[in-house]
Amino acid sequence: MKLYPHILSIFFLHFVFTTAFAQGKEDRLNKIFDVKKTFQKINSFKKYKIVTIKDAEKFLGSNTDNGGSLKGYFTGDSLKKIVEWVGLSNRIIQNEFYFKNDTLVFVYAVEKNYHYNNHSQTLDYTKLDLTFTGRYYFDNEKLFYSIIKNENRNKSKQKDAADFLIKSKDYMKILRAELR
């Protein structure tokens, strides 16, 4: 009969941990759903005031080989989306930042490398190869979920997320100054 209390304890602990894990997973899924609703709503709206900066030096601090641009999508004074486009000598980087109440909630990041032609041993600037996509989900300025399509970049997702938070704040200031 001494075994009975131990069995009850095991079942109780199993129930507590299973319930807590399920609740945590459900909370995360709800947050992901909310973020998806936010960026779908932002992308479906069509009457934005768009502020464009075509001088990469203004937002990157230096020019790039193939230029760059920064676009801010505003409704009134409220910034909803930023699109950063950077053309480097060997690739193109595009990051889309999505905001809810001036707080970063999502980043969609894409990198495409210029195709390398083995025959001519040069880059083909007419063709791009998709090399990276990343989806970063934020809650209260913390990364809580990500989908990364590149094993090497998956290792740096926390650093990438921190960089996105810093960039989003810097870009927000720059674009707001241009709006006025």
Task: Give a label for each model feature.
Residues 1-25:
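Bacterial Sec-dependent N-terminal signal peptides
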Residues 24-87, 91-180:
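Buried hydrophobic residues that stabilize the cores of well-folded domains
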